[in-house]
């Protein structure tokens, strides 16, 4: 079996994975990213989103820091409002029925604006969501709900910008590369065994990637009918998947097999009304237009 090594191995190819790779690179680490999908289908569920990202902001200057292309005229005709830490906390509690992890929630809320500025520094551009999050009242756009900005180009644009940033920083992205198991012992996780697709088939060459640290960012199990039925209940095997067909729970299963502790809400999910005639999995050309709510 061929073997290569790196400082940090990131399993997954969506927003979280790319940001983890860029952060590790900032600290001087060599990084390899494993993306199970092909170049054309890369990006995980991030590529299927609208690219809208919620963040704390206290005034228009915070918005302009994220959207420096905003003109003075656009600012003058817009009431962005504010979205405070307290409001973000309240929304997280209300929408999760207070099941949200308090420590993770605090990190998300208090670091949200700094994180957005960091993502902006990596080349991701943001614009206000005038079309969906603002109403025009007496000649002035008024935003509601605390959600104000979206990545230019939506989810696909977000993935494209982060991929460009990785390429500029010599982060190696391996496409068609599926991690099959973690390499671990009593001292921790030291890499992964990886099957590399050949000629479009996942039955390919298996290689070993040794790493000083492994970041698991491989998404959930929504594209796995068996796991949906096991954790969500009867009938969920028939559900149509809004996003990528590659999120089959591999990362979760590998982590559990390596001794990780199961945590969180396994019997709940986010689901919406979806077109009866939609394909089994998401279609990047159609995006979220199969949605019926």
Task: Give the role of each language-model region.
Residues 2-16, 32:
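Beta1/beta-strand and adjacent pyrophosphate-binding region of the FAD-binding site
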Residues 24, 275-293:
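FAD cofactor-binding and catalytic pocket of flavoenzymes
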Residues 13, 57, 218-219:
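Glycine-rich, N-terminal phosphate-binding loop of Rossmann-like dinucleotide-binding domains
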Residues 47-85:
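N-terminal glycine-rich dinucleotide-binding loop that anchors FAD/FMN and/or NAD(P) in oxidoreductases
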């Amino acid at each position: 079996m061929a073997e290569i090594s790196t400082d940090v191995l990131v399993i997954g190819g969506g927003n979280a994975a790319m940001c983890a790779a860029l952060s590790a690179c900032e600290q001087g680490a060599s990084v390899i990213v494993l993306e199970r999908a092909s170049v054309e289908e890369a990006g995980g569920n991030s590529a299927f989103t609208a690219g809208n990202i919620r963040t704390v902001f206290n005034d228009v200057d915070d918005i302009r820091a994220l959207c420096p292309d905003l003109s003075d005229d656009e600012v003058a005709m817009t009431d962005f409002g504010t979205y405070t830490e307290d409001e973000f906390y309240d929304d997280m509690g209300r929408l999760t029925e207070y099941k949200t992890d308090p420590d993770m929630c605090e990190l998300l809320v208090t670091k949200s604006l700094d994180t957005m500025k960091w993502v902006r520094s990596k080349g991701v551009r943001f614009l206000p969501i005038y079309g969906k999050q603002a109403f025009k009242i007496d000649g002035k756009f008024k935003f509601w709900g605390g959600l104000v900005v979206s990545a230019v180009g939506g989810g696909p644009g977000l993935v494209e910008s982060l991929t460009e940033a990785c390429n500029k920083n010599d982060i190696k992205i391996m496409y068609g590369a599926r991690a099959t198991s973690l390499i671990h012992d009593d001292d921790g996780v030291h890499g992964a065994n990886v099957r590399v697709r050949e000629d479009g088939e996942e039955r390919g060459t298996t290689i070993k990637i040794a790493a000083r640290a492994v970041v698991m960012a491989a998404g959930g199990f929504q594209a796995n009918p068996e796991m949906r039925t096991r954790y969500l209940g009867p009938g969920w095997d028939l559900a149509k998947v809004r996003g990528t067909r590659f999120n089959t729970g591999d990362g979760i299963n590998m982590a559990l097999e390596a001794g990780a502790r199961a945590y969180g809400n396994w019997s709940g999910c986010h689901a919406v009304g979806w077109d009866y005639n939609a394909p089994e999995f998401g279609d990047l050309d159609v995006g979220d237009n199969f949605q019926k709510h």
